[in-house]
Amino acid sequence: MVDEANFREKMKKDGYGDATVRDFLPNHSLPTHTHEFGASLLVLDGEITITMEDRSVTCQTGDIFALDANVPHAEQGGEEGVRFLVCRK
């Protein structure tokens, strides 16, 4: 399991910008959208599901997920919400 400090260090080495903490309230969702940047996240607490055209991935505390730029996806926080670090590239 990767901790917050190691995640920040790895992201910096991989060319990502500073990490930002994001919080979703329980069951908060974002409809399908894209970003003009790649993103990598580390779940600090809770659960989040990212749904793309061909699959869904549920990440829990300690999990890392990366998404390339311009990939359509939706985001769904878990029943108890989610707190995660996210970096852009």
Predicted regions: what is each one?
Residues E47-T49, S56, P72, G81:
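Structural motif
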Residues M1-D23:
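A short, N-terminal "cap"/entry segment at the start of jelly-roll beta-barrel domains
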Residues D18-H35, A69-N70:
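Conserved short histidine dyad/triad with adjacent acidic residue
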Residues L25, E36, M52, G77-E79:
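A generic beta-sheet turn/junction motif
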Residues T34-I50:
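Short, conserved beta-strand element in jelly-roll/cupin
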Residues A69-K89:
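Ligand-binding loop in jelly-roll beta-barrel domains
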Residues E53-N70:
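Short acidic-glycine-tyrosine-enriched beta hairpin
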